[in-house]
Swiss-Prot record:
The keyword Transferase does not apply. Pfam families: NAD_Gly3P_dh_C, NAD_Gly3P_dh_N. This is Glycerol-3-phosphate dehydrogenase [NAD(P)+]. Keywords: Cytoplasm, Lipid biosynthesis, Lipid metabolism, NAD, NADP, Nucleotide-binding, Oxidoreductase, Phospholipid biosynthesis, Phospholipid metabolism. It catalyses: sn-glycerol 3-phosphate + NAD(+) = dihydroxyacetone phosphate + NADH + H(+); sn-glycerol 3-phosphate + NADP(+) = dihydroxyacetone phosphate + NADPH + H(+). One of its GO terms (molecular function) is NAD binding. Sn-glycerol 3-phosphate binds at residues 108, 137, 139, 192, 245, 255-257. The gene is gpsA. NADPH binds at residues 11, 30, 108, 141, 256, 280, 282. The active site is at 192 (proton acceptor). GO terms for cellular component: cytosol. It comes from Paraburkholderia phytofirmans (strain DSM 17436 / LMG 22146 / PsJN) (Burkholderia phytofirmans).
Length: 332
């Protein structure tokens, strides 16, 4: 099978390496200098240092050439850009007249200005395209790059998209589950990043494991309330792309969003933290969108509100925690 992976960040690189073990895989990067480095070393020293990539993996800086690779019969296009780059990439496909038959995206979050979910952005740019979906689940790029076990879910209304995705990814140490709750999967992927900032703050303040467990559990309730209201199914949020991804992101030391929270608790500014990370922390990007959507639907999300207060309103992390603890008792 031919597979084109569009986006050579940590996640795109790790998945391209996995795919290249079995398939004719091409990894597209926006920067020619990065493509040159990848081709010479078979290592993404910028985003996934120390992880060796298969010699069979090929690299391309020309988007048109990468799309041509994905236009082959039964090929798969994997879009590995952040949410902020999703619309532009799909618009480029449309404008070039090079829209692959089967497309999956990996990004987690809401588009900042429109507050749209990724599938809504795709539908706006490619309204006639049907064989598409989101691949998500509890996964750190570095562990996938190292060949460690992982389980992901492909959510799509298209059986053809689900079948192509399983055929591409389900081998080695990677297990793929299938479903059709695109809304639930996308809401889970967005909200868990915001909640991971909250658990990072609690861990950074030394509030203990009890507090972490409470935040994860009550955070899951926030995620479920929002997701069901937006059209997701309740059972999705106790699966891999809901609770599973939340546990990993909220507790794992490789989590960028959790790291943001830990560093905020240590007194560092958000600008300094993001500058030092050198990677996208989607929880910061989409926190305000999540809260705005919740308020528009009169959904109570106090943990998300507390995270936004720390990120954008200058509220001290310890004060935000105190405000949560002062909330009135209620039925669970």
């Amino acid at each position: 099978m031919k597979v084109a992976v569009l986006g050579a960040g940590a996640w795109g690189t790790a998945l391209a390496g996995h795919l290249a073990v079995r398939h004719d895989t091409l990894l597209w990067a926006r920067e020619p200098a990065l493509v040159a480095d990848l081709s010479a070393s078979h290592e993404n020293a910028r985003y996934l240092a120390g992880v060796a990539l298969p010699a069979s993996l090929r690299y391309e800086a020309d988007l048109a050439a990468a799309l041509d690779h994905a236009l082959a019969d039964n090929a798969l296009c994997v879009v590995a850009t952040p949410v902020a780059g999703l619309r532009g990439l799909f618009r480029a496909m449309r404008d070039a007249g090079k829209v692959p038959a089967h497309v999956v995206w990996l990004c987690k979050g809401f588009e900042a200005d429109s507050q749209l979910m990724p599938h809504q952005v795709v539908a706006a740019e490619l309204p006639e395209h049907k064989s598409n979906g989101v691949l998500s689940g509890p996964s750190f790029a570095r562990e996938v790059g190292q060949g460690l076990p992982v389980a992901l879910t492909i959510a799509s209304a298209s059986a053809a998209c689900r079948e192509r995705t399983v055929a591409a990814f389900h081998h080695g140490a990677m297990r793929i589950y299938t479903g059709d709750d695109v809304v639930g999967v996308e809401v889970g992927g967005a909200v868990k990043n915001v909640l991971a900032i909250a658990t990072g703050i609690a861990d950074g303040l030394g509030l203990g494991l009890n507090a972490r467990a409470a935040l994860i559990t009550r955070g899951l309730a926030e995620m479920s309330r929002l997701g069901v209201t937006l059209g997701g199914r309740a059972e999705t949020f106790t699966g891999l792309t809901g609770l599973g991804d939340l546990i990993l992101t909220a507790t794992g030391d490789l989590s960028r969003n959790r790291t943001v929270g830990v560093q905020l608790a240590a007194g560092r500014t958000l600008d300094d933290i993001l500058g030092a990370l050198g990677h996208v922390a989607e929880g910061v990007r989409c926190a305000q969108a999540v809260l705005a959507i919740a308020r528009a639907h009169a959904i109570e999300m106090p943990i998300t509100q507390a995270v936004c207060a720390v990120l954008f309103d200058g509220v001290a992390p310890r004060d935000a925690v105190s405000a949560l603890l002062r909330r009135d008792s209620k039925a669970e």
